[in-house]
Amino acid sequence: MFKRKKYVDNPYPKFVQPKNHKKRPAFIRYAMRCAAQTDVARNELYYTNPLKNPITGCVLHRKRRLNEHRARALRAVVQAMLYYFNIASMLVMASVEKLSDVCGLSTYSSAGNKSITRASRLITQFMEPMGLISCEKIWDKILGMYIPKIIYLKPLFFMLFDISKIRLKRVRIKQLEWINSQLKKKGEYPITLLEIEKQAKEKHIHSALLFRKSKYIIKKQKNKAKKFLELDEKYAKSYILNNLVKKYSTKELCKLGLTKLKRKVNCEYFRLKKLAQLPVV
């Protein structure tokens, strides 16, 4: 008898606040409560508002309602988007990968390769065509690839849990007034909502580039560790020992002693072993 393949890896995704959790503004906390108390996956707006291609604007034919797995993913992603939402700029200050991770939607293959398909398809095939969000892709000429897409929340997103366009506008103006009052205290000039949006966009791009750079460094170190561990253990430890000896003076080596030096060699060997086993993100 054949065992049925799992439809999804995590059938009950849930948004989990990061460990370095900071208290979010009152409006965001209120919006998260409203979204949690409303079934955002089963809303009449989905039946009155047709799916549209975000590039061409053509109406897309919808065959069926959201299946339960995608509905659960949507409920989790809505919470995550609100948590990372910047009120004044309307930007979600997190990448699709970050949203996927905090909602438990990311999966890993047997080879350790990371997949965020479940979250990215929800965003590109449903949330964006429905008009809940809009996404912007920016091409990095230096790296020759796209920077993780910038996500903007649209008024329709908030209408899912009964926050009107007028109320959202009022909250944004209030936030702008607070930002300008802080700038005034510093002796700086006031700014507009458009300038805030531009600054938030630049911050998102900068963070994305830093994250990509750190991923590249880790990958490079991992590949180096893998190649190193292909060597015989005795030879590998001998190589580590020679490198450690170069770091210390004769006086420092005498003070360190043979036992402590051996312990340092073992620690470095097992650190490289652990690094080589890290999943590819």
Curated annotation (Swiss-Prot):
Keywords: DNA replication, Plasmid, Plasmid copy control. GO terms for biological process: DNA replication; plasmid maintenance. InterPro entries: Plasmid_replication_init_RepA. Belongs to the IncFII RepA family. NCBIfam families: RepA_IncFII_LM (NF040977). This protein is essential for plasmid replication; it is involved in copy control functions. This is Probable replication-associated protein repA1. The gene is repA1.
